[in-house]
């Protein structure tokens, strides 16, 4: 009797649960009898993956939080490894969450079980030599960005560009009017989306400055509506407090619950913290101004030790190899500077049209049916039965 393929997965974050579910669906098309177990959330369970632990049990951020939860995390890792090894998987797939997954992947690879890491760490931005450590842990890396496999190739590591799932989800042409109707916004008024990040530390650094810039912008654009989507319930009170101290007109300020994509769709221009949200804004074809601040000591350490290997911070600019979106970092991230950069987009629609054409090219480059390609790359590693 031929044994069904056995595939173990670890999704350490909500985004990984989403990726894992899409991957499982595509693997089932190729391997109808395959069995799936691991660490996941509701989406992976909906794809009929038996989860031994929930994704939320691994989702901790920040050094102090990790240290506080370290005994529990180590216990989960031990129990997962013991149980999965006894189950005899044909392949182990770690999805993102490299701090947890790479150690587990290496442990299984040392026991001659195939391992895959889905979503490369940002080795193109800093600590490129991590590629060698990653290669010691996995048989194959599945990359979301085209500039990543050539870096791994320098270290003799098998890496495949599969495309970005977000580029598959978002259509090439988007509907601003429907988004505005959903949010109760006027169809013809100027709209700015403000996204100062999803972490408390980011919002503390950027939120007030972003809202001050929006307040200054409203003086230049009468009738401006500002939408501020709170990424989660934890950060909403801080945003509400910052908004109450801002100069924004109350009637035209809209603090939303977890509606980032709808907010960006509804907007003419987006003011956004550097991170994944910049990629989403690009795929939605929205002009943006990108900003970021970290603690001064952290910034000095990064600059002094030359830890960053890139001259650009925003993902659209990195992908394009040119400055498509203004970047205002550290001391340059001031309300007047942000306001001026935002106003430039509002006042020059011809620049917006040219930008949208360039964003469409990048969207096309990233849209590769990521889950399908990832499933193909994993199927190749399975033993022939």
Curated annotation (Swiss-Prot):
Pathway: Bacterial outer membrane biogenesis; LPS lipid A biosynthesis. It catalyses: a lipid X + a UDP-2-N,3-O-bis[(3R)-3-hydroxyacyl]-alpha-D-glucosamine = a lipid A disaccharide + UDP + H(+). The keyword Lipid metabolism applies. One of its GO terms (molecular function) is lipid-A-disaccharide synthase activity. Transmembrane segments: none annotated. GO terms for biological process: lipid A biosynthetic process. Its EC number is 2.4.1.182. It comes from the Bacteria. Keywords: Glycosyltransferase, Lipid A biosynthesis, Lipid biosynthesis, Lipid metabolism, Transferase. One of its GO terms (cellular component) is membrane. InterPro entries: Glyco_trans_19 (IPR003835). Condensation of UDP-2,3-diacylglucosamine and 2,3-diacylglucosamine-1-phosphate to form lipid A disaccharide, a precursor of lipid A, a phosphorylated glycolipid that anchors the lipopolysaccharide to the outer membrane of the cell. PANTHER family: LIPID-A-DISACCHARIDE SYNTHASE, LIPID-A-DISACCHARIDE SYNTHASE, MITOCHONDRIAL-RELATED. Belongs to the LpxB family. This is Lipid-A-disaccharide synthase. It comes from Xylella fastidiosa (strain 9a5c). The gene is lpxB.
């Amino acid at each position: 009797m031929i044994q069904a393929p056995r595939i173990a997965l670890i999704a350490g974050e909500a985004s990984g649960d989403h990726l894992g579910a899409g991957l499982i669906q595509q693997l089932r098309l190729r391997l109808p009898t395959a069995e799936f177990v691991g660490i996941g959330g509701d989406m992976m369970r909906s794809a009929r993956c038996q989860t031994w632990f929930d994704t939320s049990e691994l989702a901790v951020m920040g050094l102090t939080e990790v240290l506080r939860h370290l005994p529990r995390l180590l216990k989960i890792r031990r129990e997962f490894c013991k149980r999965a090894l006894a189950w005899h998987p044909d392949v182990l797939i770690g999805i993102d969450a490299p701090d947890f997954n790479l150690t587990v992947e290496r442990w299984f690879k040392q026991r001659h079980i195939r391992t895959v890491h889905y979503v490369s760490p940002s080795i193109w931005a800093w600590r490129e030599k991590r590629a060698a450590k990653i290669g010691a842990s996995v048989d194959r890396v599945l990359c979301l960005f085209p500039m990543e496999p050539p870096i791994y190739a320098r270290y003799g590591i098998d890496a495949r560009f599969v495309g970005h799932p977000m580029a598959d989800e978002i259509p090439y042409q988007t509907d601003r009017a429907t988004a505005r109707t959903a949010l109760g916004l006027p169809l013809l008024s100027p709209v700015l989306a403000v996204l100062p990040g999803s972490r408390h530390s980011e919002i503390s650094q950027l939120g007030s400055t972003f809202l001050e810039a929006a307040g200054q912008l409203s003086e230049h654009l009468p009738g401006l509506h500002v939408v501020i989507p709170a990424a989660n319930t934890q950060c909403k009170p801080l945003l509400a407090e910052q908004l109450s101290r801002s100069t924004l007109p109350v009637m035209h300020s809209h603090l939303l619950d977890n509606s980032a994509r709808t907010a960006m769709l509804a907007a003419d221009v987006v003011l956004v913290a550097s991170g994944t949200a910049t990629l989403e804004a690009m795929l939605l074809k929205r002009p943006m101004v990108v900003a970021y601040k970290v603690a001064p000591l952290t910034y000095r350490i990064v600059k002094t030790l030359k830890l960053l290997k890139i001259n650009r911070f925003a993902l659209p600019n990195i992908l394009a190899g040119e400055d498509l979106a203004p970047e205002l970092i550290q001391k340059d991230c001031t309300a007047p500077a942000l306001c001026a950069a935002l106003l430039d987009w509002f006042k020059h629609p011809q620049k917006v049209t040219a930008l949208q054409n360039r964003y469409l090219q990048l969207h096309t480059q990233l849209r590769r049916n990521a889950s399908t390609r990832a499933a193909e790359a994993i199927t190749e590693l399975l033993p022939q039965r």
